[in-house]
């Protein structure tokens, strides 16, 4: 089976960004929980994300392996997590996650778009390396 929202199409959440002075106050978690409510209202039953587990487990996300959801080749990415919005909707079957073509953005196109925006200072955060490691690691 292909992991889909029962014919509803896909919804994408790229990032939840909270200004540094407001982090660790629960705002990100509240935004995510609100998105769950909205998704259920729209008829969605499952959320699959790629992220750092330390940011999402407290919102109810669990390892994709626990739900038997893998990527091509039967691999379970360490950064791929799942939250059932409707309990037991995935019913123990094996599911395959496939990226949407919408997610394939070229670096050149992204740079052209960025060039139209107000210039901001680019920064590097340790969490970026953490995510890189997690997103290139697999559970066995």
Per-region residue spans from a language model:
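Conserved acetyl-CoA-binding loop-helix of GNAT-fold acetyltransferases
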Residues: 13, 18, 24-39, 48-49
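Single conserved hydrophobic/aromatic residue that forms the stacking wall/gate
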Residues: 1-12, 56
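Conserved active-site alpha-helix within GNAT-family acetyltransferase domains
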Residues: 41-44, 51-75
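Acidic/histidine-enriched, glycine/proline-rich intrinsically disordered or flexible terminal extensions
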Residues: 88-140
């Amino acid at each position: 089976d292909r992991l889909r929202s029962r014919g509803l199409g896909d919804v994408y959440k790229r990032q939840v960004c909270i200004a540094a002075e407001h982090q660790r106050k629960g705002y990100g978690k509240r935004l995510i929980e609100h998105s769950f409510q909205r998704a259920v209202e729209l008829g969605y039953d499952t959320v699959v994300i790629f992220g750092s587990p330390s940011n999402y487990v407290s919102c109810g996300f669990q390892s994709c392996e626990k739900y038997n959801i893998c990527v091509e080749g039967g691999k379970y990415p360490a950064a791929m997590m799942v939250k059932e919005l409707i309990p037991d909707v995935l019913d123990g079957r094996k599911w395959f996650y496939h990226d949407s073509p919408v997610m394939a953005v070229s670096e050149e196109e992204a740079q052209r778009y960025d060039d139209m925006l107000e210039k901001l200072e680019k920064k590097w955060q340790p969490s970026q390396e953490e995510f890189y490691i997690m997103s290139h690691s697999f559970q066995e």
